[in-house]
């Protein structure tokens, strides 16, 4: 009996030791794989345009978080958490896109949408190049090939080790970033790092950044295009607050040079809630704001007194939401899911905003919808 007990205990010890060794080995692998991309990294500009920018016209620019081609109407994401009206907590399920064919179809859809709008400039976020989660579809290549007469820049903001969570559908290894397109010649581009968490969660989060593309204007100033994707899940919004400060400093520095600045993308901040231009009497709010879910914990709001300087103006619309919560699929929960406007543009005060519109496509290709800004350039300093 004692021998049997010893064998059982010995077997359990070996099994437990093996499990511990695997866990330690995996943690070591994640730690070794982690590195932050250097700040102020010079980016390659793929030059296809021969057009110079004349200040005396109206331009259009789009921004679109394409969600790595995964967020079709039947998709929910494992990191998204929300609460129903009765307080019931709901959590998304998936880490990867369902099928490679679905990623290709979604990517083709977001390309076609922007092509039909014939914009002068375009920002895309969550553009995968070689990721497990998007079945290794090179979305950046697809986008740039479709806009072959545009200059293009790609800045990496997610380069992870193979992540084993969620265990039911591991997200795997990721390579993803921000893609910027311009009909006009981009003279140079740079990647600037955002502050991120210094805790253990940094090993699983994006390497947050914004890409800066400079275009010469015929009045001896620069049009500075900034493609940005701020943090989403930092508790208490402390990291996002630091990122806002970086944005403010960048604006002041560029505007003081007399340059025009368009800072666009996914701010992961509600751009309407405290906006003085969009305060509604009870019952007068847009129809799309009628949903049953409670505001998610991750959603912060832009503070229009603290987060902006005199050099900045928010270009945003309330005609449609730009983001839906992904803690549940859209199908079956269209009237329940929390929706918001977190995508748009903040521009320098020497830019005239002609109009802004959120394109309502029913969240067909992503958990975000595109935003279009028409603008003109005023006199530089």
Region roles according to the model:
Residues 51-61, 73, 174-192, 204-228, ...:
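Beta-strand-turn-beta hairpins that frame and shape the catalytic cleft
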Residues 60-66, 92-96, 106-136, 181, ...:
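Active-site beta-strand/loop signature of hydrolases that rely on acidic residues for catalysis
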Residues 93-99, 127-130, 194-202, 229-238:
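Surface-exposed cleft-lining segments at the edges of enzyme active sites
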Residues 129-134, 203-204, 234, 335-336, ...:
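Acidic-and-aromatic substrate-binding clefts and catalytic sites of carbohydrate-active enzymes
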Residues 6-11, 23-51, 252-262, 269-381:
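Metal-dependent phosphoester-hydrolase catalytic domains
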Residues 4-146, 154-165, 169-175, 379-381:
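N-terminal, active-site-proximal structural segment of metallo-dependent hydrolase catalytic domains
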Residues 72-77, 136-137, 164-168, 193, ...:
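Short aromatic-enriched loop/helix-cap "lid" or pocket-rim segments at secondary-structure transitions
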Residues 66-69, 127-131, 157-161, 186-187, ...:
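Solvent-exposed loop/turn segments at secondary-structure junctions
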């Amino acid at each position: 009996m004692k021998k049997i007990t010893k064998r059982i205990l010995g077997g359990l010890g070996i099994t437990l030791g093996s499990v511990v060794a695997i866990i330690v080995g995996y943690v070591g692998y994640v730690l070794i794989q982690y590195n932050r991309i250097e700040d102020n990294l010079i980016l390659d500009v793929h030059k296809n345009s021969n057009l110079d920018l004349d200040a005396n016209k109206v331009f259009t620019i789009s921004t679109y978080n394409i969600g790595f081609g995964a967020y079709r109407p039947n998709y929910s994401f494992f990191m998204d958490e929300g609460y129903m009206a009765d307080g019931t907590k709901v959590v998304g399920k998936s880490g990867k896109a369902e099928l490679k064919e679905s990623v290709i179809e979604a990517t083709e859809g977001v390309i076609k949408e922007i092509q039909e709008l014939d914009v002068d400039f375009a920002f895309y976020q969550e553009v995968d190049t070689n990721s497990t989660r998007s079945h290794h579809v090179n979305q950046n290549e697809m986008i740039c090939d479709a806009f072959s007469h545009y200059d293009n820049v790609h800045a990496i903001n997610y380069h992870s080790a193979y992540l084993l969570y969620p265990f039911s559908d591991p997200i795997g290894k990721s390579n993803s970033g921000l893609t910027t397109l311009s009909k006009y010649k981009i003279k140079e581009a740079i990647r600037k790092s955002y502050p991120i968490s210094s805790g253990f969660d940094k090993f699983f989060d994006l390497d947050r950044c914004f890409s800066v593309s400079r275009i010469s204007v015929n009045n001896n100033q620069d049009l500075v295009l900034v493609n940005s994707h701020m943090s989403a899940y930092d508790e208490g919004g402390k990291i996002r607050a630091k990122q806002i400060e970086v944005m403010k400093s960048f604006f002041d520095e560029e505007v003081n040079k007399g340059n025009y600045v368009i800072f666009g993308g996914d701010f992961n901040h509600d751009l309407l809630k405290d906006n003085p231009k969009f305060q509604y009497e009870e019952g007068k709010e847009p129809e799309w704001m009628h949903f049953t879910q409670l505001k998610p914990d991750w959603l912060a709001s832009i503070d229009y007194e603290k987060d902006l300087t005199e050099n900045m103006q928010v270009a945003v619309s309330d005609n449609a939401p730009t983001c839906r919560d992904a803690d549940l699929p859209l199908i079956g929960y269209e009237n329940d899911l929390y929706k918001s406007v977190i995508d748009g543009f903040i521009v320098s005060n020497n830019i005239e905003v002609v109009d802004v519109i959120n394109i309502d496509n029913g969240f067909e290709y992503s958990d975000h919808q595109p935003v279009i800004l028409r603008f003109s350039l005023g006199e530089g300093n």
